[in-house]
Amino acid sequence: MTAGSVCAPQIIPLRVPQPGKANHEIDTNTLLEMKSDTPDVNIYYTLDGSKPDFLKKVGSGENNTFKYVKPITLPDGKIQVKAVAVSKDCRQSGIVTKVFQVDYEPPKMVSSEDNVEDALKGFSKQELKNGFVGPKLRKKYKNAENKSTWNVNLRRLADLKVGERADPKTLKDLRFAESPLEIPAYHEGASARLPTHQAQSPGFAHITGQKSLTSTEIMRIQRETDFLKCAHCLASRPSDPFARFCHECGAPVPPIFGYRLPPPEGAQMGLCAECGSMVPMNTPICVVCEAPLAPQLRPQASLYLKERVICRTCGTGNPAHLRYCVTCEGPLPPTQEQWLCNGDEVPHPPARNGETISCSRCGCQNLWEASFCDWCGAMLGISASHSVCPKCGASNHLTARFCGSCGIYVKSITRFRMHNSLAIVAGAPRPFPEPRSAWQSLNVPLPTSASGSKKDTGTQTSGLFYPSGKLLAKKELEAASHRQRQEKMSDHRPVLTAVSPGRGYWRKQLDHISAHLRSYAQNNPEFRALIAEPRMGKLISATVHEDGYEVSIRLNYIQVSNKSLYFNKSVNLSDHFLSSVTEGGNGLYDSRSSLVSAYSQSVSDTPESIKKMKNLKAKSFLVNPEPLTPENKLLLEEVGSSGKGRLSVLEQLLDEGADPNCCDSQGRPAVIVAVVNKHYEAIPVLAQRGADIDQQWGPFRNTALHEATLLGLEGRESIATLLGCNANAQKKNTRGQTAYDIALEMGDDLTSSLFAAKFTQGLEDQLSPPGNRILGDS
C-alpha cells in the first residue's frame, strides 16, 4: 500500500460461525460491522449494488448512499453491499463489494428489563462518544392514566405532516404531561408513515430491519438517552430543535414535541466572589446571595496591556508601533494599524457570492479556499463558529452538508478551510474539491513594444505523426486483448481436493491428478530427483487400470536423447505412408520386416543416414486396436500362459488365416508373448510365416530378444532360438541398451556367451565368401 492511501473498509458479520453455513449466509437479525484500519475516516455504503457517492447533491437523482454510524442489519434476499472509506481531507479508498444471502428470521421478542439493559450496553463506543448517552436515568414508568393521556395527545399529532404547525392546546398538553419523554407511540406511528418516502428509494430497505427492538426497549432507550437519529441515513439529529432537515442527507426529519431550549454554555456561568457559587453572569445580582455582579466583572487595574507583536526570529514581544525587534533588530510582521498609518490601501477584490474570508490583520478579503492572505501573507484563521446558508441565511454546523432550515446543499466553507489548515500543520497536501483559480486577474498596463522588433519565424510541422482517435482506441483494444491472453496463458494451479468427482467430469479428474502429483512431488525428494532427470517429448499413450482398490494410470512419453532423436513407437509405420495407399504398400519398402530393419539400421548408422531418416515425414501415431479375429485370438491363447505352444495347432491356425504379427490387448506381439511364456518352440514357426521378431513394444521399446534376456536362465533357449532366426542383437530400447548390454548388467555369463558367439559368427560371415552364408540371411 502506498504512503498516504486509505485502507479499504472491511464488512464483517457479527455472529458466531455456524456449521454448514458459508460466511455470506446470514439472517435479518445479524449485524454487519464496517471498519477500516485507517483511523478517523467515514465509511459510506450502498445496498443496491450502486457505487457509493458521498458528495451527491439533492435533486441530482436518487441518493442511495448512507453513512455508516453503527452496525446495521439487512433485509431478506440477495443483498450486494458496497462500501468506501473517506478521510477528512476527502481521500478515498478502494470500493469493497460483498454479497450476502439474507434469510428472514423473526426478531427476538425480549420484554425483561435485564435484556433491555444488555441492549443498551451493546451500542458501540463511537455512538457513546458522539453523544448517545442520556444525562441520567429517568424515573420508572408512571401510572396507566398518565400514559393513556400522553398517547391520546400523540395520536392527534401523528396525522400532521412535516413542517406543519400543531394545535397549541395539544402542544401545551404534551409539554406539561407527566412523562414528556415517553413517546414510543409516536415513533411507532412515525415509522409506519416513513415507508411512503422510503418506497422511492430501495436502498432504505435496511432501516426497517434495523429497528427490531420491542416497544419496551424503545421506551427504555428513549427515556434514558433522549436521542433521535435520522430515519434515512442514521446520522445524529441536528442539535437545533427547530431544524427540519437532516444535515447529512438533507431528508426531512419529524419535529420533536415538547421543545426544550439547549442549556446555557459554560462561558455564561461564573463564580460569585461573595458566596462562591456558580451563577449566571448575565444577571445584575447573584441569584444565591443577591450580591451585585457588575463590580465583580470589572478589571482590578485600570491599565490595559498594549498590543504586542511577536518577533518571528527570536520570539520577543515588541510594542505594536515598532517595525524592528528590540532584541535581534529583525523585521517585525506589520499590523493592521501600520497598514492604515502608511496609507497603503488594502485591495478588495470583487465578492463572489459571499465566498470570501476577511484577514484578521489587514482586513483584506480573500478567497475562501486561501490559507494565507494575498496582501499581508498572514495565515487565515477560522473566525466563524458556524456556516451560513446562502439561500435562507440560517446558521448551520461547521460539518453540515445540507441546510437544516431549507434543506438545500450547502458548501461548508468553514469546514474545508479547517481541513486546509489542518493539512498545512500536518505537512500534507490540501484537498481541493473542485477546480479553482489561485489568483485574481489584474488590469496591469504593459509597456508597448516597438513595431520594429517583430520577426516572422517558422516551425517544422511536416513529417510529424499525430495519432487519430481511432488509432488510439485500436491500441487500447489491442492492449486489453493482450492482457486477456496473458491471463489465460498464466499457470493454472488446480485446487487440491480429497476425492475427485468422477461421473464423467474429465476436466476435474485431470485437475485432481495434477494437484496430487504436484503435492506428491513436493513431499518426496526421491521422486523429485527421478522426475527431474529424463527429457520427455510428447505423450504417445495413456492407460487407466482399476482393480477395485487402486487406480493405476500409466503415461508413456517419447524420450529425447542427447542427439535430440525421437524414438517413436513403430506400430505398422508402412501403413501410414502415402505409398501404402497409392502403390499397395510396396512403393517404398518390400515388407514390414524390411521397414523395421531399415528404421533400426538408420538409428545406429552414420549421421548421413540420420539426415535421410529426418527427410521421411511420416507422422507416427497410435492406431486403435482392431478387434481380434477368432484365429488370432486362438493363436494368442496357444502361445499365452494358458496355452501349450503346440506346433501343429499353430500351423493349422496360420493356415486358416491367423496373423503372425497380431498383438494382444496390451499391445504385445505374438513373438514376445511366446518368449515371455517360454514357448520357444513356437518362435521359428512364427518367424517362417512372416512374424517380425525385432518388433518393439511397451514404454521401454523392448524387442523379443530384450524380454528373453530379462528372464535370465529361463530365457536362454528363447535367446538361442531368436539368434538362430537372425534376430537383430544391435537393436536398442529407449534406454539405449541392447540385449547384450542387459546381459552384462545382470552379470549372466551364460547369456553373454551366447551373444559373444553370435558376434563371432557374424564376423566370420563377413570374412567368408557370399556363398557360404548361413540360411536366413537372405
From Swiss-Prot:
Involved in vesicle transport in photoreceptor cells. Interacts with NINL. Associates with DYNC1H1 and multiple dynein intermediate and light chains as well as actin-binding proteins. Keywords: ANK repeat, Cell projection, Cytoplasm, Cytoskeleton, Metal-binding, Phosphoprotein, Repeat, Zinc, Zinc-finger. A zinc finger (DZANK-type) spans 230-289, 359-407. It comes from Mus musculus. ANK repeats lie at residues 631-662, 666-695. It holds the Pfam family Fn3_assoc. The gene is Dzank1. This is Double zinc ribbon and ankyrin repeat-containing protein 1. GO terms for cellular component: cell projection; centrosome; cytoplasm. It is found in: Cytoplasm, Cytoskeleton, Microtubule organizing center, Centrosome; Cytoplasm, Cytoskeleton, Cilium basal body. GO terms for molecular function: zinc ion binding. The modification Phosphoserine is found at S179, S201, S768.
